[in-house]
Amino acid sequence: MVPRAPRIGDFEPYRPQLLRGQTDDSDTSKLSVPLSSQSNEADDEQSLSDPSYDMESSADSPQYEGEDTRLTSNKELSGFYMYGWAAEVFVVCGIGSFIPVTLEQLARENGVLLSDRTTPCKAPRPITPSFSASSFEALLRPNPEKGQCVVHILGIEINTASFAMYTFSISVLIQALLIISMSGAADHGEIQENIPLVFAFVGSIATMLFLPVVPKVYLLGAVLAIISNTCFGASFVLLNSFLPLLVRFHPTVRYPESSADTSYVSDEEEDDSQTPTQERIEHEARWANHLSQREAALDEPANVTTALLPSRAPLTSPRVKPSTAPSQELALSTKISSYGIAIGYIAALLVQTMGIIVVIFFQSSNFGLRLVLFIIGLWWFIFTIPTARWLRPRPGPPLHLAPQTSNFRTGLAYFSYSWKALARTATHARLLKDVLLFLTAWFLLSDSIATVSGTAVLFAKTTLGMSYAMLALINVIATLSGVLGAFTWSRLSSFCALSPVQTILCCIFLFELIPLYGLLGYLPAVQRLGYLGLQQQWEMYPLGAVYGFVLGGLSSYCRSLYGELIPRGYEAQFYALYAITDKGSSVFGPAIVGAITDRWGEIRPAFWFLAVLVGLPFPIMLFVNVERGREEGAALARKLEELSRLRDEAVVAAEDEGEDENLSRDVRQGLEESFSYQRS
C-alpha cells in the first residue's frame, strides 16, 4: 500500500547526519523543501530557515483571484479516470460498433433495392428473445448478400451504407465548430469543469433516446447520433485540458524528492478551499525526505526516479538524474494518461461483451441494437456523476468584463474570444516548431488510425464474409489488446530506456505492419498458399490484437507528449487545436479509400494508400525535440503573460479606440520579433 503523510506529530522524522561545524541542536541545519520548476531537470532546494525563504516560492501562489493551487489529490485523479471509464464505452462500443449498424439498419428498413428501386429491402420481423443454438449459429454464419439499398432524403437518393457515413461527417463538422466556439473560454472563469459535464450528460441522454427510435423515424436516429458524437468530442477535449493541471500540482512534481507518487493531501484538506499552510508544507517535506531514506520509488520508471538520496546523505544533497531521462512532469503525465486510456478500455470491454449478449438474446433484431445503445448511454450518464463530484473546477483567469454585463453579452464575449483565441493559438503553434511538427504528424497518424479501422471492418465484412458476431469478436480482441498496450508501453519504454518520441516511433513501426501484411496477398507465392496476406478470416484476429496494442500506446503517449509542448495556461485552446487536427483529418482517409474501392471494385488496393499514410508520420516525429519544445512553450507562456499585462494596463489608460488598435499591432509585432529566431 502506498504510504501517505501522517498527521503532524505522528512520526519522528529522520535526523540527518550533522554537517561540519554544526551541533546537534543547531538552528541552522537545513530541511530540504523541493521547489516547483518548469522542467524539473534539477532539484533546486531552499532552506526554510534561510532569510530569503518565502512560502510562496515553495508553493505556487495564486496568480489571480479564485485560482486553485491545492495539490492534486487521489480523489481528483479518480475523477479524471472515472470519465474515461464512463465515456470511452461510447466511442469504442457506440461509434465503433453499434451506432453505424443501427443507423444502417434503420435506413435499410425504409429503403428499396438499388437494382429495381421498388422492392423493399427488409420487412420488419417480430422480436423473439432466445438463447437457442440456432441463434448462435445464425450469428456465426456469413451473412448472405442482401443487395444494395437506397433511401430518399429530401428527394436525394442515398445509399443506406453511406447514411451513417454522412451522419458522422456532419457530426464531426459540428463538433469542430463547437470546440472552436468554446475552447478558448474554457481557460477562463469557473466553466472549465461545468461545460464538459453538461456536454457529457446531454450526449449520454441522446444515446439513451435511441431506444424509442423506430424505423419510421430513422432520421431522428441520425439527429441523436450527431448530438451524442458532438457532445462526446467536446467533453473529451475539455477534460483533456485537465491533464497538464493535474500533473502541475501533483505532489511528486511539487516535491520531487518524495518516493511515493501519490497525493499527500488528507481527506480533510481535499475539502478545504485554502492553499496548504507553511506548517503543512514543512511537514510534508519532512515526510517526503523521511520516505526517501527508507525505500525506493514506488511504481516509477527506473530512469526517472533513480539515485534517490542514500540512507546517510544530508537532506540538502540534490538527487542526481541522468541527463537523458525524461522530466518528472512528462513521466507522470504519460502514466496518468496511460492509466486513463486503459481504464476506459476495460469499461469498453465490459460493455462490449454485454452488448454482444444482448444482440444474441434478441437475435440481431433492431430493438436489440437500440437496447445496447440505451445501455451505453446509461453507463455514460451514471459514471459521469463521480467525475462531477470529484474533479475540481480549477478555474482560469476571468475575462475582463464590465460588472453589469448581461448574460447574453457575456456569452457573446466568450464566443468571440474563443474564435480570436483559436486564431492566436494557430499563430502561436506556428511559432512553436515542435508543436507544429507534432500536429503535422498527429494529423496523418490520426487519419491513419481511423482509416485503418474502418477499412479493416469493411474488408472483413465484404471480402472475407465475416458475420457481425465475428466482427464484434475482433473489436473485443482489439479492446483487450488496447488495455494491455496502455499498461505495457510505459514499462516497455522504461525497460528499453526509450524516450517518449522513440516509443511513439515504435508504435508507428508496428502499425505499419498491418497494411504491409495485407499487401502480401498480391504475391503469387502467398496466393498459392491460400493463407497469409489476409486471405482467411482467422488472420483478422491477430491483426486486431496488433491494432489495439499499438492504439493503446499511441493514445496515451501522444496526448501526454503534446501536453508537455504547449504553453501553461493555454491548455484548452491548444487541446482544441489537437482535437480539431484529430477530427479534421478523419475526413480524408476514408474518402480516399472509398474512391480507390470504387475505381478498382475491391478494397485490397487501398492497402497501398494505407501503407503510405501510416508511414508518413515516422520521419516527421524524428524531428520532434521534447526539451526544446518545452523550453519554447514556457518562453511563449511568459511572453504572452507579459504582453497581456502590458496590454491590459494600456487599455485602461487608452482614451480612444485608435490607441488600442495601435497597441494591438505593436503587441503582435513584438511577439513576432521575440520569436523570430525560431523560424531561422
Swiss-Prot record:
Q: Does the keyword Magnesium apply?
A: no
Which topology term describes how it sits in the membrane? Multi-pass membrane protein
Keywords from the UniProt entry: Amino-acid transport, Autophagy, Glycoprotein, Membrane, Transmembrane, Transmembrane helix, Transport, Vacuole
**Glycan-modified residues:** 303, 662
Q: Which InterPro entries match?
A: Atg22, Atg22-like, ATG22/LtaA_families, MFS_trans_sf
Q: What does this protein do?
A: Vacuolar effluxer which mediate the efflux of amino acids resulting from autophagic degradation. The release of autophagic amino acids allows the maintenance of protein synthesis and viability during nitrogen starvation.
Protein name per its UniProtKB record? Autophagy-related protein 22-2
What is the species of this protein? Phaeosphaeria nodorum (strain SN15 / ATCC MYA-4574 / FGSC 10173)
